[in-house]
UniProtKB/Swiss-Prot annotation:
The lineage of its organism: Bacteria, Pseudomonadati, Pseudomonadota, Betaproteobacteria, Burkholderiales. This is ATP synthase gamma chain. F-type ATPases have 2 components, CF(1) - the catalytic core - and CF(0) - the membrane proton channel. CF(1) has five subunits: alpha(3), beta(3), gamma(1), delta(1), epsilon(1). CF(0) has three main subunits: a, b and c. The keyword Membrane applies. One of its GO terms (molecular function) is ATP binding. GO terms for biological process: proton motive force-driven plasma membrane ATP synthesis. HAMAP family: ATP_synth_gamma_bact.
Amino acid sequence: MATGKEIRGKIKNFESTKKITKAMEMISVSKMRKAQERMRAARPYADKVRNIAANLGQANPEYIHAFMKTNEAPVVGMIVVTTDKGLCGGLNTNVLRSVTNKLRDLQSAGMSAQTVAIGNKGFGFLNRIGAKVVSHVTQLGDKPHLERLIGPVKVLLDAYARGEISAVYLSYTKFINTMKQEVVLEQLLPLSAARMQAETEASETASGAKHGWDYIYEPDAQSVIDDLLVRYVEALVYQSVAENMASEHAARMVAMKAATDNAGNVIGELKLVYNKTRQAAITKELSEIVSGAAAIGA
C-alpha cells in the first residue's frame, strides 16, 4: 500500500495537471470564438462570388469553364484538411478514417489518387500510409491566409484544368456547434452549374432579396467567369479551413474540460485514500500506545 507521502506526491502532480488542462480549456474557448467569427465572415464572400458566377453562367450557357467539364482520367485529387496540433479528441482520426475509406474505394475501382495535405497531422498520416502527396501546407497558425493555401491547392486545380484528374474531393470537419462537429467529404470539382444556381436561388430566397443581373462585364463575361470560378473554389477551400479551425478549438475545449474533470475525480479519490491511510496510521499508533501503557501498568 502506498505511503501518505507518496499519495501526497500523486495529488500534487494531478493538481498541476488540472491547472494546465484548465488553462488550455480557457485558451481554446477564446480561440474558438475568434475562429467562429472568422468562419462566419468568410461565408458572405463565397456566397456572393457563387451567385455572380452562377448567374453569369446561366446568361452564357454556350461557355463551359474547365472546372465544369467532366474528365475521364483514372486519377482523383483529394484535399485533406486536418490540424497542426493534437489534443483535440477524435477530430483528426474521424477525418483521416473517411479519407482512408475513400482511398480504398478508389483503389478497388482501379483509380489512383493525388492528395494535398493542409495541416501537419494529415500530412504525416498520408506519408505513413504511402499516399501520393503532391503538395502540402502546415503551420497555418490561428489566422489562416488565403495566399498560403492557393499554391498547394493550385497544383490540383491546374491538373484538373489540364484534364489529368477526373475529380477533386475536399475533406474537413464542419463546425455545427460547440458540442458537435461533422466530417465532410464532398466533391469540389467538377462544379455543377445546376447546383450553384440552386444554392444561389436558395440564398436569395432566404435573404428575401432578388438581384437583377443585367450588367456589363469588362473585358468580357467569359473572362469574368474564369476569374470568379477560380476565386470561388479558393473561397470554398478557405472556408473549409476556417470551419476546421473552429471545430479544432471546440473539440480541444471539450477534451480539456473532460481532462480537467477527470483530474478532479482522481484527486478526490486520492484524497480519500490518503485520509484512510492516515487514519489507519493514527489508529495503529494509538493501539501501540494503549498496548504499551497496559504493559507498563501490568
